[in-house]
């Protein structure tokens, strides 16, 4: 059996839709259930940020998770395939009508992705004070908590509604299929076959 960790929400639905197309049967979680067993697969429904943890500790053999989460957590997992779903961007944003003053001794940046932000600004040789937030990141520069934000956006609509603009795209992200290293060697044939089927389906869709 292969255990698959899925992030709650649209990515889980799109992934299960692909399983249905590949295997010709329904893969649907019962209401409020977090575990789904079907044939040779067991699916776990977890928070997006927790997918790498489940896979890393082999509670799941493979997982579906955003590249932004992988980069933020620097998880030691095998990246099998970019699924091309859940596309989004990690961006720097600041209030409309003003520019970020990079000449300041230190810029205040609000974000929940401190590792990605830290690495990006280190490459730019810029001194930043990273303020860790867990939600409503857009609020920070509007109330003087930060000069700018590093956040994840799909369309940028939420930023515009909060009078923020995108100053720079740090990285583009989409959902990846990843595997635990031990699981990969123990179940290599099955995992590679699943990767092949998903890759084939992706090519058809593109």
From Swiss-Prot:
SUPFAM superfamilies: Periplasmic binding protein-like II
PROSITE patterns: ATP_P_PHORIBOSYLTR
Gene3D superfamilies from the UniProt entry: Periplasmic binding protein-like II
GO biological process entries: L-histidine biosynthetic process
Cell location: Cytoplasm
Enzyme class: transferase
Keywords: Amino-acid biosynthesis, ATP-binding, Cytoplasm, Glycosyltransferase, Histidine biosynthesis, Nucleotide-binding, Transferase
Pathway it works in: Amino-acid biosynthesis; L-histidine biosynthesis; L-histidine from 5-phospho-alpha-D-ribose 1-diphosphate: step 1/9
Top-rank taxon: Bacteria
Recorded GO CC terms: cytoplasm
EC nos: 2.4.2.17
Catalytic activity, as annotated: 1-(5-phospho-beta-D-ribosyl)-ATP + diphosphate = 5-phospho-alpha-D-ribose 1-diphosphate + ATP
PANTHER family for the chain: ATP PHOSPHORIBOSYLTRANSFERASE, ATP PHOSPHORIBOSYLTRANSFERASE ATP-PRTASE
Functional note: Catalyzes the condensation of ATP and 5-phosphoribose 1-diphosphate to form N'-(5'-phosphoribosyl)-ATP (PR-ATP). Has a crucial role in the pathway because the rate of histidine biosynthesis seems to be controlled primarily by regulation of HisG enzymatic activity.
Subunit structure: Heteromultimer composed of HisG and HisZ subunits.
HAMAP family (alphabetical): HisG_Short (MF_01018)
Free-text note regarding domains: Lacks the C-terminal regulatory region which is replaced by HisZ.
Similarity comment text for this entry: Belongs to the ATP phosphoribosyltransferase family. Short subfamily.
Matches recorded under NCBIfam families: hisG
Protein known as: ATP phosphoribosyltransferase
Organism: Wolinella succinogenes (strain ATCC 29543 / DSM 1740 / CCUG 13145 / JCM 31913 / LMG 7466 / NCTC 11488 / FDC 602W) (Vibrio succinogenes)
Organism ancestry: Bacteria, Pseudomonadati, Campylobacterota, Epsilonproteobacteria, Campylobacterales
Gene from which this protein is expressed: hisG
């Amino acid at each position: 059996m292969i255990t698959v960790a899925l992030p709650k929400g649209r990515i889980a639905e799109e992934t299960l839709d692909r399983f249905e197309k590949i295997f010709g049967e329904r893969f649907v979680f019962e209401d409020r259930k977090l575990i789904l067993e079907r044939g040779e697969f067991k699916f776990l429904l977890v928070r997006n940020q927790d997918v790498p943890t489940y896979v890393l500790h082999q509670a799941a053999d493979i997982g579906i998770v955003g590249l932004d989460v992988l980069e933020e957590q620097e998880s030691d997992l095998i990246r099998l395939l970019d699924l091309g779903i859940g596309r989004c961007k990690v961006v720097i944003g600041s209030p409309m009508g003003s520019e970020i003053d990079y000449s300041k001794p230190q810029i205040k940046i609000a974000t929940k992705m401190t590792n990605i932000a830290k690495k990006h600004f280190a490459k730019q040789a810029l001194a930043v004070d990273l303020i860790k937030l867990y939600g409503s990141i857009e609020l920070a520069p509007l109330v003087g908590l930060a000069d700018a934000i590093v956040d994840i956006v799909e369309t940028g609509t939420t930023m515009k509604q909060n009078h923020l603009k995108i100053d720079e795209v740090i990285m583009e992200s989409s959902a990846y299929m990843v595997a635990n290293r031990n699981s990969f060697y123990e179940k290599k044939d099955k995992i590679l076959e699943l990767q092949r089927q998903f890759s084939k389906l992706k090519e058809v869709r593109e």
